[in-house]
Amino acid sequence: MTVDTKAQAVMSELSDHETMLHEVDMHASVPKSGLRADAILVDQEVPFGLDELFFSRTDTRGVIRAFNPVFLRVAGYGAEDMAGAPHKLVRHPDMPKGVFWLMWEGLKRGHSVGAYVKNRARDGRFYWVFAVVSPVDGGYLSVRLKPTSPLFATVKEVYARALERERGQGMTPEQSAKAIEADLIAAGFANYGVFQIEA
């Protein structure tokens, strides 16, 4: 099963969940009161259930156009703050830039991509997700769920090494992406694409 096939399966299940996507009127004036610039980091995980899926839709630049209540609750933002904000609003500094480089390369080629992502909530706590991001008309749809795979522990180790290389050796995102893929190959995966499928 490819990541694209997995993404289609997840999207077809969306109708089985009672989720209300909040559509953003991109012409409305949206106040961004209280957005964190550099919230302190808290070494505490935001709890959420295995049955809770996050949804968000962005334009091609990563600006949030729609989202569901689970995303708002776990990330700790109000709809007025999330609407029209860049998706990197929830990016955690522990995430290697190489992972995002791999994701964007796949998306630019028109493929769905999957990745483990550590996010930062508004209050500085963190939450891990497995994200499946797919190109849709005019942007991207991201569906995220709680990681449960045994590969999750391996991913944390790979990400820690990647982050150390980025910070200590000054690797560019592209160099880091290649090093991440090399680490995954050393762990027994043919390439990042195969890893996404098995993750």
Each predicted region: which residue ranges?
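Intrinsically disordered, low-complexity N-terminal regulatory segments enriched in Ser/Pro/Thr/Gly
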Residues: 19-27
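Sensory coupling linkers of modular signal transduction proteins
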Residues: 138-198
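Sensory/regulatory domains in signal-transduction proteins
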Residues: 2-18, 34-164
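N-terminal flexible/basic segments that precede or flank functional cores
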Residues: 26-35
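A broadly tuned "polar low-complexity/structure-edge" signature
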Residues: 45, 61, 193-199
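Extended hydrophobic/Leu-rich segments
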Residues: 10-14, 24, 171, 184
